[in-house]
Amino acid sequence: MFRTVNGEDYSPAVQQRNILDFGKSHSRLWTDNGSANDRCETGGNCRESGQDRVKRPMNAFIVWSRDQRRKVALENPQMQNSEISKRLGYDWKMLTEAEKQPFFEEAQRLRAMHRDKYPGYKYRPRRKAKEATEIASRRLFSTVQPNAHRGDVVPLPIQGRLRQGHTFTNGKPVKPLTAHEHKQLTPATGASQQLDKPAPQ
């Protein structure tokens, strides 16, 4: 399965050692010629493809974890990225302040470079699609219809989520309708008698 070329051993252990040695001697490979994310971190072009979004400068943990992540991944090729992240977080917490200091200094240097390159930069996190949908849903349910009458069920603006099925009437929680009660109601009839029952505590 393994072959010898020019008398060199190409076993997995030797290959892994060669990769690590290559990475140490060619560290610019990992930074200047890396991905767009790496180019941003080293002061290169920080704009994402097709967007005018500037990435944040790296913090001390990210500076430290970049090289550590590569080492852990090479030592444990079967390890999932989420497991590597957990391990790196634990290892970072175990470092002393003196061991972390060079990474804080490098992060400070990168922050200063970023500030010089983008003087008007302000961090604006992108909202995920799910969050945007939830916000739109809250806005929809928090608006009062102009034809709503006193005593009608009026959705209120909410912070977070309510238990499914509970609603409010005049600011008071009311008992959710059962399937049988719901069938008895028609769109033309009011539900004031059902809705005026206080919610169980």
Curated annotation (Swiss-Prot):
- Alphabetized GO MF terms: calmodulin binding; DNA-binding transcription activator activity, RNA polymerase II-specific; RNA polymerase II cis-regulatory region sequence-specific DNA binding
Please give the biological process terms from Gene Ontology that the record holds: cell differentiation; male sex determination; sex differentiation
Which Pfam family is an annotated match for this chain, by its short name?
Answer: HMG_box
Q: Which keywords are on file for this protein? A: Activator, Calmodulin-binding, Cytoplasm, Differentiation, DNA-binding, Nucleus, Sexual differentiation, Transcription, Transcription regulation
Is Transcription regulation set as a keyword in this record?
A: yes
PROSITE patterns under this entry?
HMG_BOX_2 (PS50118)
In terms of superkingdom, the source organism counts as: Eukaryota
Which InterPro entries does this chain map to? HMG_box_dom, HMG_box_dom_sf, SRY, SRY-related_HMG-box_TF-like
Major place of residence: nucleus
Q: According to the UniProt record, where is the region Disordered?
A: 162-201
Q: In which residue ranges is the amino acid composition biased (Polar residues)?
A: 186-195
Where in the cell is the protein located? Nucleus speckle; Cytoplasm; Nucleus
DNA-binding region located at which positions? 54-122
Q: Can you supply one Gene Ontology CC term for this chain's record?
A: nuclear speck
Does Zinc count among this protein's keywords? Answer: no
Q: What is the purpose of this protein?
A: Transcriptional regulator that controls a genetic switch in male development. It is necessary and sufficient for initiating male sex determination by directing the development of supporting cell precursors (pre-Sertoli cells) as Sertoli rather than granulosa cells. Involved in different aspects of gene regulation including promoter activation or repression. Binds to the DNA consensus sequence 5'-[AT]AACAA[AT]-3'. SRY HMG box recognizes DNA by partial intercalation in the minor groove and promotes DNA bending. Also involved in pre-mRNA splicing.
Under the subunit heading, UniProt states: Interacts with CALM, EP300, HDAC3, KPNB1, ZNF208 isoform KRAB-O, PARP1, SLC9A3R2 and WT1. The interaction with EP300 modulates its DNA-binding activity. The interaction with KPNB1 is sensitive to dissociation by Ran in the GTP-bound form. Interaction with PARP1 impaired its DNA-binding activity.
- Family listed: Belongs to the SRY family.
This protein is called what?
Sex-determining region Y protein
Q: What is the lineage of its organism?
A: Eukaryota, Metazoa, Chordata, Craniata, Vertebrata
From the UniProt record, report the name of the gene that encodes this protein.
SRY
